Every structure is written in structure tokens, then in C-alpha cells.
Amino acid sequence: MKKMITLTMIKNEADIVETFVRYTMNYAYKMVIVDNGCTDGSREILEKLIEEGFNIEIFTEANVFYEQMFLENKYIRKINATEEFDYLVPVDVDEFLYPQNGNWSIFEGLPQNQISIIEWKTYCLDEEKSIQNIFE
């Protein structure tokens, strides 16, 4: 199976971060998460997931103002320099990759060294939706 690493930046995502990690680890080999100053328990949730055995690396960038593009590029370069992988996927904490028919093997056929587009669903909490039914 191809090795995929995801890169995610978070700030105060306690309502979704555990579900995001558990779902994403269905296809990711490792998750790199950049904590941009969480104060709602998100980091503690991630640390408990690491204790459970999830392959997560957390970096801290607690900047009040930041340009996401620059931070993402910083960590893309860092990952490229320190990790062995087949694919690197920047994904937001509210984005759940969702291949057609739930066929995760689609990742095996993606070409390397170029950009690919993968379907995803976005999680938004409101009175009508919950994480259990976003894939309906």
C-alpha cells in the first residue's frame, strides 16, 4: 500500500478533531498536525490519540496572525526533507476524503509527482447535521 502523509493546521477544533483523525487514519500512514494555538482541548485530544498508537506528529505555531500558505509550505518542505512517503495530502480538519463507493484503493492508482483531485465531504455542525450522517 502507498504511504500517504496528511498535513493539517488546527485551531480550536475539539468538536471534530478526534473523528477527523480516526477517519483519516483509514488511509493515511501518518498525520502531521500544526497546532495554531488551540485552547479548547484539541491538543490534549491529539495527545491521547498518540497514546492510543495513532501515528501523529504535532508542531506548534501559536501565531495570532499567520498566512496559511507560508506555514503549509514550511511544513511541506519539512516533511519532504524528513519523511519517506508516496503522497502528501494537505487537508483541513473539517474535510473528509471520500472516494466513490468508499473504495480506498483509488489512492493506489494516483500518479505521483503531480496534483490529483480527490472527492471529499466537508463537516459543518448545525442543528440538522451530525458527523454520523455527513456521508448520506
Please give the residue ranges for each predicted region.
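Short beta-strand/loop segment that forms part of the nucleotide-sugar
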Residues: 29-37, 59-61
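Catalytic-site signature of metal-activated, phosphate-bearing donor transferases
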Residues: 69-76, 99-136
